[in-house]
Amino acid sequence: DLVDKSIKLGMPAIALTDHGCMYGIKELLDYCKKTNKKLKEKAQEEGTEFVPFKPIVGVEAYCARRSRLQRDKDLKAVNAEGKAYIVDQSGWHLILLAKNMQGYRNLCRIVSASFMEDSYYRRPRIDRDLLEQYHEGLICCSACLGGELPQKIMEGMSAMGGENGNINSENTFQAAEETIEWYKNLFGEDYYIEIQRHQTTKPGADQHVYQVQREVNPVLVELAKKHSVKVVATNDVHFVEEEHAEAHDHLVCVSTNHFIDDENR
């Protein structure tokens, strides 16, 4: 179990940020309540200080690239090689965490709105308009490589031929910096830039994500310094134990309509 494993590893808290939904939140809160009761009883018996385990309510939202009300099935863009491709309109990833009851209520409003018929396209989507309406009480993090900020950094790097270049060079990361300023202006001190580093030596495992993280992370850190935004290191956890990896891989294939042996899935 996620909570038990976290406690075993000495972690004081964990955030549950399921993709696009909050279905697991009640189960998390109920389980933490029972667990904290047991931890308190154990602390009293041993005469030690009781430190409750903290569940953090959140979601990894899909933020539409433009408006959640637009469904541009054939929207195209051009990559660094000059080839046109269909833009995925399901949205960038964005982490939202409730820091108080107002934040929890706003999180519920945002997620509920994302499932409405006019918002849903492939996935439940939010947009900047929703964030402007319901940002109070929320902590916002830039998310994984699927987030708007990392994606715009990668676009800047691609335009430069894949080299990091000079952070301060004009227009190199202009879109990324505009993204930072927009979220910083909205969330203030509650906006964080995430860095992740998921290295694996397991045979057959995908090494591409780690390679990209190594390229993007230094840019994230430098831009965070430049714009006075705090950096937080996170783990993009999708299963508890290593032996669960295969089952998770099968689940991903089901959700993305792919086969295990598909290339470039």
Regions found by a protein language model. Name each.
Residues D1-R265:
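Phosphodiester-processing cores and adjacent nucleic acid-binding clamps
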